[in-house]
Each structure stands twice: as structure tokens, then as C-alpha cells.
Amino acid sequence: MKAAITGLVATVTTFLAYIVFLSYTPRVDKKSPQFTPNTVPLVGSWSFFTQKWAFWQDCVAKSQTGHFSFWLGKYHVVGVSGAAARKVFLDNPNFDFVRGATLVGHGPDFVPPLHAIFHGNFQNGRSYFQRRLVDLQKSEQLGKRLPGVTRDARGAFEALRQHASGVMNPTDACYRLVVQQACRVVCSDEIADDPAVLARTQSVLSLLMHTSSIHAVALPYLPSLAKLKRRWGRYGLSRIVTPIVQRRLQKKKDAPRHDDVVQYMLDRGDSPEWMVAFFISTLFIASANAGYLSGAMLNILAYHPDWQARIYREIKTVAAAHAPNPHAPLVDQLDTIPLDAWESFFPSIDLCFKEAIRMWVAFPMIRLNMAPHAVPIPGTDEVVPAGTFASYNSTEVHFNPELYPDPYRYDPERFREGREEFKKEVYGFVGWGQGRHPCLGMRWAKIQLNIILAYALAMYEWSGCDEKGQPSTHFDRKTDLNAPGPSLPVGLFCKYVPRKEV
């Protein structure tokens, strides 16, 4: 009995000590913006994750300066708003976006610790990850991958003819294609060309995309199925890419040579361990947003026939201008379009893509102030202290009616030269990143979307419908600005009808 009581006392004491530890609030710089009352003991301002835009609006409205402080577990975060603060947030060289991943519970990378591939050990402070991602998007490399990725796109849309209903949610079909092309552009043809391995890769990436462990920010030691699934996802990708790298290292001199990304990196003497880490991270990044956006763009064009017709005319014009035989079937002409044309000659797709990103990829961006000193917030005597996270919600600028009149309406023309109301403010559009951290994968992302839409529209006419194929002209944005992640119009269905002239 005495032993039982002693054990109970020890357990209760340990539990109370843990509660005291969790409830301890570290001191912060006195010039930090005022803390929001929207907080929960131990956890902090959890609405930052669960009610993203409502939380942000409420905090800004209650702040005299538009800036505010809040806790996420033990982490101090400063939310900033307005054009001047946005510019500092995006331009300050001490604001580290990679370490901002500490507060993001998605994907195969767990921060901290920060893997060596993300350390700025190269020229101009670039990391191995940044250096190789840029290298793989140089014209020489993308030119080598172009025949493969166009073949992937053509094959994916030709396969749709096997479905008699002609009804689909294009996000599902496009995701497999995006993963296949990503494997080819940032990893290995061995994955892209093997249906079984490609299916495994797609399955693991899908698991990671639909798993979030943001609760671990506040309670890092709490057992979590989500964290376990994320680690399992990282292990799953490692099991796919590691054997490929190892086989190449052990390959005999007279064996057939692969000309893909794995071989490119090995030929440059890259560390096999760093290569595997790079492939794991990049495959997830290259598939995540593109997997959603490509399907979403088909949804959008199906419900906007005027833009679909406009883009189709551009496709025919570009194909005829570059095809050896302008009288060949349109899909055959597409097979011969050079890289520079894929990149530069589809202005209507670019307008539609920017508007889709503006409306459906709006979220709080996070940076960590790595400077040994506080960073002043313009127009105030407030600061972002050293070692503190800063956050800016891109919804603020992307749905600002002064920059985007009638912001809830899909209107690609707002990005056309001669309008561009968003240029009234510096960094009025942040969809591709801005300042110190533009999107490093932007070049490939644009080329990839142009290729996918070109083959989709060359082969089929698309129209909106319900799940049973009944025509529908009502375009429901299905955008929840408070959602934990970007909310895209992926719940819509499309009907596709083969064109008479393909």
C-alpha cells in the first residue's frame, strides 16, 4: 500500500512539474507588439492554424499598429500587416524561411534539426538544396527532360479515352501526371518509367500531403499518429530513392548509362546522403502545389469557356509556328515545341495561373529572425525580436479590394498589362514569392502547367458538370480562407469530349 501511494505521489508530482514547465512563459523584448488575448493556456493561439484568416483579421483589428504577438506553444510569433511591414518581411536577409518550417507540420522534413542540405554553405549564402534546384531548371537540363515530360502528358490524357463516362475530377488524374513529371525533372527516370515504383511514390507523397502534425508545435512530446505517418512517409521515399543511388554507384563501367538527374548529380561528385535528402524534399515540394493547381486549372477552364477557347487558340498558333509539319495532328505538333516556346508563348495561361494562385493559395507565411538583434517594424517603435518568428498572411494583400477590385471574382484580366492594379503597392502580388525568397521552382512550375493544359485542351473540350455528368455552369469557388491549408476548387467535376481534330 505504501509503495502504491509513493508511486502515485511520484506520478502526480511529475505531471504537475510538466504542467508548470509547459505553462512557463519566456520573457520577450519589451518592444514586441502587444499580445493578442486570443490564446489558450499551454497551447497558445491555436486559431492561427484552425481559423487562419478570421484570427488574423481579429488580431489586426484589435491592434493599434496592425501588428501583434502571440504564442504557439513555447514559440513567440509576431504577426505583421500592411505594405511597409510586408516589404521588410520579404526583404530582410535575416528572416529565414527554411527555419520557418519549425511551425509547419507538413511534409517529410522535420525542423529542427535543419539538414545540412539547407545550410547556406555555398556562394552567396546559397544552400546545396537551392543550388541544385536552380541547376536542374537551367535550359540544358530542362531541354533534356522535355521529351519525357511531354510524352508523359500525352500518355496521361490519351488514357482518358478508356473511360466511357467522360466525367472526372481532373485533380485526381493530374496528380499522377505531376508526380511522374516531377520524378523525371528532379530525380530519376527509373521512377517515372516504372508504373509500379511510380505508384508507390505517388502513394507515399499522397500520404504526406494529407497528413498534418501541427499540434506538435505546442506539444512536441505528445505521442502522435500524424508524426508517425510523416516519418513513415519520409522512410517510404528513402526506400525508393536510396537503392537507385546505390545501384548507380555500384554500376560497372560497361553497363548502360542513364542520363537523368541522379546521374547528373553523381557525375558532379555530390554526396549520396545529401542526394537522397534532396530527392525526398524536392519530390514532395514539386508534387504538392502543382498536383492541386494543375487539376484546379482544368476545373477553372471547364467553367470559363471563354478562357478555354482563348488558350486553345494560343495552343494552335504556337504549335503551328514551331511544328515541322503544320498540317500534322495538333498533338503531334505539340511534341515538337521547343523549351523556349513552352516557357514564353502562352500568355493567357499565365494570366489564369496567377489569378488561381492569388485566390486559392493564400496563407500565413513564416520566417525566423536569425539576426543577433531585433528588426524594427516600419512606422512603429515595435520590433521583431532576435530568435522570434515573424508571420505575414498573404490573404491580406491578395484580397485587398484596393489592389484587386471585386477580389472574390475570378478575373485573370486583372494581371494584364494596362490594368495591374496590384502594382499600386510594392509586392502587391506574392504568389511566386518576392524579395529575398522568390519561388525557386517557378520556372519549371510554369512550363509544366503550360504542357499539361496544352495537351489537355488539344485533345478535349472541357465543360462543367456534376458528379453524374449533368451540365453545370455554376462555378463555386469552394475557397475557405480559414482552412488549415490552401483550399482549391478540387471538388468540382468536368466533362471532357474528344475534339474532332486532334
From Swiss-Prot:
Assigned GO CC terms: membrane
Enzyme class: oxidoreductase
EC annotation from Swiss-Prot or TrEMBL: 1.14.13.-
UniProt xrefs under CDD domains: cytochrome_P450
Gene Ontology MF terms: heme binding; iron ion binding; monooxygenase activity; oxidoreductase activity, acting on paired donors, with incorporation or reduction of molecular oxygen
Biotechnology: Secalonic acids show unprecedented anticancer activities against various human cancer cells and might be interesting for further derivatization, targeting diseases such as cancer.
Subcellular location: Membrane
Binding-site residues, heme: 439
Transmembrane stretches, start-end: 4-26
Pathway, per record: Secondary metabolite biosynthesis
Membrane disposition: Single-pass membrane protein
Top-level taxon in the UniProt lineage: Eukaryota
Primary location recorded for the protein, binned into one broad class: membrane
Sites where a glycan is attached: 393
Cofactor: heme
Gene3D superfamilies: Cytochrome P450
GO biological process: secondary metabolic process
Entries under SUPFAM superfamilies matching the protein: Cytochrome P450
Keywords: Glycoprotein, Heme, Iron, Membrane, Metal-binding, Monooxygenase, Oxidoreductase, Transmembrane, Transmembrane helix
Main function: Cytochrome P450 monooxygenase; part of the gene cluster that mediates the biosynthesis of the tetrahydroxanthone dimer secalonic acid D. The pathway begins with the synthesis of atrochrysone thioester by the polyketide synthase AacuL. The atrochrysone carboxyl ACP thioesterase AacuM then breaks the thioester bond and releases the atrochrysone carboxylic acid from AacuL. Atrochrysone carboxylic acid is decarboxylated by the decarboxylase AacuI, and oxidized by the anthrone oxygenase AacuG to yield emodin. Emodin is then reduced to emodin hydroquinone by a yet unidentified oxidoreductase.
Family listed: Belongs to the cytochrome P450 family.
Protein name: Cytochrome P450 monooxygenase AacuE
Organism: Aspergillus aculeatus (strain ATCC 16872 / CBS 172.66 / WB 5094)
Gene that encodes the chain: AacuE
